[in-house]
């Protein structure tokens, strides 16, 4: 676990090709990864479940383990929480707050918002000492274990590449080659459907339709 694989090499190479606008090679590399047995989780949140790490959607992730010689635990519980005192044993650093714009950009019904981001309020945590007007922080990398204190106590791995990344890279490359490519839209819509808690393999009302302008898409 935690070692680079042929799948992670091909997926990373696809990402490099994408930055170089070498779309044909993006399609080539993503095609190879799609033949390697990876699968998307039906539930988006499973990607960040400590009990499901290195699972079917994982291509490469940084490994963390607490109280293990030679292996570091994560300290995301500190980084991604506001500075407050004695809240269920957690103490946050107050680093890396999420912007209001990011929090509000999720569409209504998109389940990813409350998985990815948490809004901390004075009403919920009256002893929170934060000067942030909008104290939102990354939520998906929190380890819920009471043993996961802020200093390297978390066991939640950090995903670098997921199979969903392959879908999205492929969608972008296919669309760049041919803006009416049906597969490009299907790759994108598979990810969108899951985000809204729908069957990934069935057309839905939230699907992105061909022919949208950039402004409409955004």
Q: What is each of the regions a protein language model found here?
A:
Residues 55, 83-86, 104:
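N-terminal hydrophobic or amphipathic segments with adjacent small-residue motifs
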């Amino acid at each position: 676990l935690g070692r680079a694989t042929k799948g992670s090499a091909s997926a990373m190479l696809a990402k490099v090709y994408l930055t170089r606008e070498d779309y044909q090679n993006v399609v080539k590399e993503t095609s190879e990864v799609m033949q390697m047995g990876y699968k998307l989780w039906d539930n988006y949140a499973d990607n960040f479940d400590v009990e499901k790490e290195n699972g079917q959607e994982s291509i490469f992730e940084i490994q963390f383990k607490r109280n293990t010689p030679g292996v570091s635990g994560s300290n995301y519980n500190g980084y991604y929480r506001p500075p407050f005192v004695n809240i269920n044993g957690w103490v946050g650093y107050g680093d890396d707050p999420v912007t209001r714009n990011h929090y509000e950009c999720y569409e209504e019904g998109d389940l990813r918002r409350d998985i990815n981001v948490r809004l901390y309020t004075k009403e919920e945590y009256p002893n929170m000492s934060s000067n942030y007007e909008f104290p939102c922080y990354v939520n998906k990398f929190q380890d819920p274990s009471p043993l996961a204190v802020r200093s390297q106590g978390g066991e939640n791995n950090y995903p670098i590449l997921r199979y969903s990344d392959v879908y999205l890279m492929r969608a972008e490359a296919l669309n760049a080659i041919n803006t009416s490519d049906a597969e490009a839209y299907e790759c994108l819509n598979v990810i969108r459907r899951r985000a809204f808690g729908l069957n990934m393999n069935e057309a839905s009302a939230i699907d992105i339709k061909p022919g949208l302008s950039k402004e409409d898409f955004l």
